Amino acid sequence: MILAVTVPEDYPDDLTRRVAISSSIYPDPHTHIETVTYGHAGDSMSTLYTLLVGDGTRVTRPLKLLGQIVRHPVKFAKTLWPQGWSRRTIIVLVMQTLDNAIALRPKLKRSGAVRLQTEQDPERPNPTFIPVANEAAEWLAKRTGGIAQSSLTEALINVPTTAHILGGAVIGHDSEDGVVDSCQRVFGYENLLVCDRAAIPANVGVNPSLTITALAEHAMSKIPAKDAQVNGASGSTAGRAGSRAS
């Protein structure tokens, strides 16, 4: 889930003069919050945010947003002005280790084109509101005199925004229960591997860059040298030049 806090124009510091992701906290055992900046050229990202909105449904959350606009018209007007937004904005990136999931389903459009559409897992739905996320944004806004913001999709249609869509290429024993094997090789295809976040089998709850790197290294370690022989499904080498078994 992604929220934002925009500090006042007279704030003394340029928030982009720092490492993009520099600090994080665990407000509870399942939740990890990072502060992020987009950099000087990220002003257009302001169109993805609006005033902070609380919990609700697809019906009540837009009404709550309307109420926020009526109560805070000046703050709302400021969120509509993109110039300098990125320099003055802290992104609040909220991640959890809870076992929830969404699915991507093909949907046929009237034009005949096919597009992918997300669908909630009925048994493990992805949360559309995380109380501690709003609390963190409100706390940061209070400390800086800034404006706390929800993502536009969250406020208007009760759909959260994520930076890390994980999974999709399931690790399995064979093509009946997975896409790739334990070495991340795609079943039924030669020399095709999945080395990105699609192969991550669980919700890691933190920025997954290092996990992706580790998986990629694992997959590469199973590829034999050009002059080696592949020994079974494990991808280990039977011998190398100058030391082959006779």
Identify the residue ranges that each predicted region occupies:
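Short, glycine-/Ser/Thr-/acidic-enriched flexible segments
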Residues: 7-12, 26, 97-100, 176-178, ...
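Short conserved micro-motifs at the rims of enzyme active sites and ligand-binding pockets
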Residues: 13-17, 30-36, 101-108, 180-183, ...
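A conserved FAD-binding loop/helix module that cradles the flavin
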Residues: 202-220
